[in-house]
Amino acid sequence: MKIISGNANNKLAQEIAEHCFANLVPANISTFADGETSVEFLENVRGQDVFIVQPTCTPVNDSLMELMVMTDAARRSSADRITAVIPYFGYARQDRKSASRTPITAKLVANLIVTAGADRILTMDLHAGQIQGFFDIPVDDLTSRVVFSKDIKRTIGIIDDPDVEQVGTVFVSPDAGGVVRARKFADMFHGDIAIVDKRRPEAGKSEVMNLIGDVKGKH
């Protein structure tokens, strides 16, 4: 197994490598004067199971291009299998046509990553589950619920004792699209959910119209 890090989150890649008792593959990732991305692996990856850790976060376009160039480099270096580890999947919010003459960019990005040579995708809490269907390769959409549940439990002081009366807990979804995620958290803590009803008058702006649900006096 070989783990390779892009520039988007080298610290995360290092922690993953340490957890797996592995070393990061050294790589030269540079930018030419005209802005082009250049990649060279400094270790043999032939026949290896390669994991490329590169969330496509800000700057999204640069991170995405770097991921694709690294994936292509691994493929042309004869890696046996290439897994793109993308904790944050950029363009995920563009998963459908928002108007008559707009693209479905999440699908385009999926096509680009597959064409670059990825055999498998590892991501976390996709904005919309249907994005998994945009790929023609396996996609593992991991959840952060187990990690966050420990902090939530500690923060609100939940006690594992059915005889102790506790203040109600409510999980608020910021929009209709997050209801399923909020419901899963609520089920874990036997809580309720609330939904923020909002509208987007223009790109990048939202207005809260209503709060659906009861949050008074609750965590």
Language model features by range: what are they?
Residues M1-H219:
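PRPP-associated nucleotide enzymes
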